[in-house]
C-alpha cells in the first residue's frame, strides 16, 4: 500500500511540474467549473508570443539578433523541437533555415509532409554563443514558453531532434542512440527522439535510422 501511495505522489509531482511549465499555477476549486474549450480564456500562439515579448529573462538576450519563436501550423499533428537557433536562424528569426533546416524539409517531404503542415520550434529561442549547449538557467527561462506552445498546438506527436532536445523533454540523461526510434509519453503526447539534421550532415550514414524513425511517425499519423 505504501509503495502505491509513493508512486501516486511521484506521478502527481510530475504532473504538477508539467502544469507549472505551461504557466498554470492554480486550478479551479472544487465545485467550480473549469473553462470549456473554445472560450475566450483559451490562449493562442500569438498570446504566448506577446507574453514572451522582447525577452530578457536570461543572459542569451545580450548576444542575439532576433528571438526565434517557432513557426508552422497552429493545429499541427506533428511538432518538431530542436535545440536552439544557429547563425542563420538568429539572422532570419525563423527555425531551421540553414543547411540543417533544408535537410529537415527534405526529411519531411520523404513522408509526404509539407513543412507548412507541421510546427517547428526549439528548446530555447535565442542563439547561444558559439552554438554551445544551453545552460540550466537558460532552459528554465525558456521552457515555460515552449510548454505553452505545446499546450496550444496539442500535437499528436512530438519529434525531438537531437540529444539535447530529447533529454530535456523527457528529463533523462540517456544517450540519443538509446532513446531514438521509440515512443515516449509526455502528458498524453507521443514523443519520438531522432538524430538532429545537423548531426546527419556530419554523419550521413545515420540517415537510414532517421528514415526508419520518420516511417514510424508517418504510420502513427496515418492510423490516428
Predicted region positions:
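Short, small/acidic-rich helices and loops at N termini and domain boundaries
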Residues: 1-9
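A polyanion-binding, active-site-adjacent surface
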Residues: 10, 14-21, 25-224
Amino acid at each position: 500500500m505504501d509503495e502505491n501511495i509513493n508512486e501516486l505522489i511521484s506521478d502527481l509531482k510530475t504532473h504538477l511540474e508539467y502544469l507549472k511549465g505551461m504557466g498554470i499555477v492554480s486550478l479551479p476549486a472544487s465545485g467550480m467549473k473549469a473553462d470549456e474549450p473554445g472560450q475566450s480564456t483559451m490562449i493562442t500562439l500569438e498570446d504566448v508570443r506577446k507574453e514572451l515579448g522582447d525577452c530578457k529573462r536570461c543572459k542569451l538576450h545580450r548576444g542575439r539578433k532576433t528571438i526565434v519563436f517557432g513557426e508552422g501550423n497552429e493545429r499541427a499533428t506533428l511538432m518538431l523541437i530542436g535545440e536552439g537557433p544557429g547563425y542563420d536562424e538568429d539572422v532570419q528569426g525563423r527555425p531551421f533555415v540553414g543547411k540543417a533546416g533544408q535537410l529537415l524539409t527534405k526529411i519531411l517531404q520523404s513522408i509526404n509532409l509539407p513543412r507548412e503542415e507541421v510546427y517547428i520550434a526549439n528548446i530555447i529561442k535565442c542563439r547561444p554563443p558559439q552554438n554551445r549547449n544551453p545552460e540550466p538557467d537558460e532552459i528554465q527561462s525558456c521552457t515555460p514558453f515552449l510548454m505553452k506552445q505545446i499546450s496550444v498546438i496539442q500535437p499528436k506527436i512530438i519529434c525531438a531532434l537531437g540529444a539535447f532536445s530529447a533529454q530535456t523533454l523527457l528529463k533523462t540523461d540517456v544517450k540519443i542512440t538509446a532513446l531514438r526510434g521509440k515512443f515516449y509519453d509526455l502528458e498524453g503526447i507521443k514523443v519520438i527522439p531522432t538524430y538532429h539534421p545537423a548531426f546527419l550532415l556530419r554523419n550521413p550514414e545515420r540517415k537510414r535510422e532517421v528514415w526508419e524513425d520518420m516511417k514510424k511517425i508517418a504510420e502513427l499519423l496515418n492510423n490516428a
